[in-house]
């Protein structure tokens, strides 16, 4: 049996879990107030504070740090890498510290994992960060030579549910053609072939379907004109794409369940936005099916919004002619991180090296 500590830092909380193999024996969300977070100038400056909070929580739960076989952290905004479990090394720590692709709380996952693991002489890993990039070269072409397409998506959950589905049907993930749709604060639609995500929309930067707080792809000419209208700053326009775009820009709420409920009660504006969301997701699935030349084993709906039966039914109604539709509501990031660590500890795969 292997015991793992899992660390998943978010902007205002740190989720931790203790796993004995795949069994969760302890889980806690450590919430951090805005006042606490505001004391620190950079994400990295929060490192010692968050580490201490984690160690205090373990002590309170009578869990000995010395009982751990490995520590797994959420991967941050590193350089683009292929999917897998990575041993935390010096190069990774440097890139997480400076934030080579941006500052995000998830950058602390590998840093804290390494620090705790080092003290008890066990390995530290990260698994499938959002920067997983396995795009086919043809997918990188955007149509504008100085803007290549990038892969930024919900890699951890997409990979975890794809593997889960493969296990359930008794096949290898690498042998299946899948379209995986993650619907949460952002929406990512990934094309999985031969164990790689060869095509996916950039969830963070305005590609693909809109979501509760992100715009997805919008008419480019109009966006350019908006940028030069002298009405908005750079930061305000970026916020329209990520943070104040999508559902919230139309209805002033990010609660998509409430939007669906109102739509079903007859609210016409909510009904239109709800239909537009399912329409855009279905359209993106259709695009991905052409990447696989129609040879699709399954379409998987996942993420928080996939708990909503009405949303899933509406999408399935449009895409079931392509392939069977499977639903895995929510996202179990702690388990997905634990599974990644276990695959290496059991020798099922080798830990990758970050360069």
UniProtKB/Swiss-Prot annotation:
Chief place of localization: cytoplasm
Subcellular compartments: Cytoplasm
Annotated keywords: ATP-binding, Cytoplasm, Kinase, Nucleotide-binding, Transferase
Disulfide-bond pairs as recorded: none
Molecular function per GO: acetate kinase activity; ATP binding; butyrate kinase activity
Catalysed reactions listed for this entry: butanoate + ATP = butanoyl phosphate + ADP
Entry EC number(s): 2.7.2.7
Pfam families found in the cross-reference section: Acetate_kinase
CDD domains, per database record: ASKHA_NBD_BK (cd24011)
BP term (GO), one: butyrate metabolic process
Matches recorded under InterPro entries: Aliphatic_acid_kin_short-chain, Aliphatic_acid_kinase_CS, ATPase_NBD, Butyrate_kin
EC top class named in words: transferase
Matching SUPFAM superfamilies: Actin-like ATPase domain (SSF53067)
Domain of life: Bacteria
Pathway(s) of this molecule: Lipid metabolism; butanoate metabolism
Gene Ontology cellular component list: cytoplasm
Protein's job: Catalyzes the conversion of butyryl-CoA through butyryl phosphate to butyrate.
Assigned protein family: Belongs to the acetokinase family.
Name of the molecule in the record: Butyrate kinase 1
Taxonomic source organism: Clostridium acetobutylicum (strain ATCC 824 / DSM 792 / JCM 1419 / IAM 19013 / LMG 5710 / NBRC 13948 / NRRL B-527 / VKM B-1787 / 2291 / W)
């Amino acid at each position: 049996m292997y015991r793992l500590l899992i660390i998943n830092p978010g902007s205002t909380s740190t989720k931790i879990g203790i796993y004995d193999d795949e069994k969760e024996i302890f889980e806690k969300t450590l919430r951090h107030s805005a006042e606490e977070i505001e004391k620190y100038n950079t994400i990295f400056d929060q490192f010692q504070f968050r580490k201490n909070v984690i160690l205090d929580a373990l002590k309170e739960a009578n869990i000995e740090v010395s009982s751990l076989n490995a520590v797994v952290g959420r991967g941050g905004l590193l350089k683009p890498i292929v999917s897998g479990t990575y041993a935390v090394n010096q190069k990774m720590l440097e890139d997480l510290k400076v934030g080579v692709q941006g500052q995000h709380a998830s950058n602390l996952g590998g840093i804290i994992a390494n620090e705790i693991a080092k003290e008890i002489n066990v390995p530290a890993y990260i698994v499938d960060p959002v920067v997983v990039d396995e795009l086919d070269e043809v997918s990188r072409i955007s149509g504008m030579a100085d803007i290549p397409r990038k892969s930024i998506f919900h890699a951890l959950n997409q990979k975890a549910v794809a593997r889960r589905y493969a296990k359930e049907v008794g096949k290898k993930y690498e042998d299946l053609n899948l379209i995986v749709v993650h619907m949460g604060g952002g929406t990512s639609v990934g094309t999985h072939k031969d164990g790689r995500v060869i095509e996916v929309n950039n969830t963070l930067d305005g590609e693909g379907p809109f979501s509760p707080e992100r715009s997805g792809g919008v008419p480019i000419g109009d966006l350019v004109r908006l940028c030069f209208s002298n009405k908005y700053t750079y930061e305000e326009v970026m916020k329209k794409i990520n943070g104040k775009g999508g559902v919230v820009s139309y209805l002033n709420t990010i609660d998509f369940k409430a939007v669906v409920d109102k739509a079903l009660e007859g609210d016409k504006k909510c009904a239109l936005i709800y239909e537009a969301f399912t329409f855009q997701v279905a359209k993106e699935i259709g695009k991905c099916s052409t990447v696989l030349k129609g040879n699709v084993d399954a379409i998987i709906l996942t993420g928080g919004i996939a708990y909503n039966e009405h949303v899933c039914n509406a999408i399935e109604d449009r895409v079931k002619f392509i392939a069977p539709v499977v639903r895995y509501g929510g996202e179990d990031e702690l388990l997905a991180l634990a599974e990644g660590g276990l695959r290496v500890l059991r020798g099922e795969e080798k830990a990758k090296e970050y360069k």
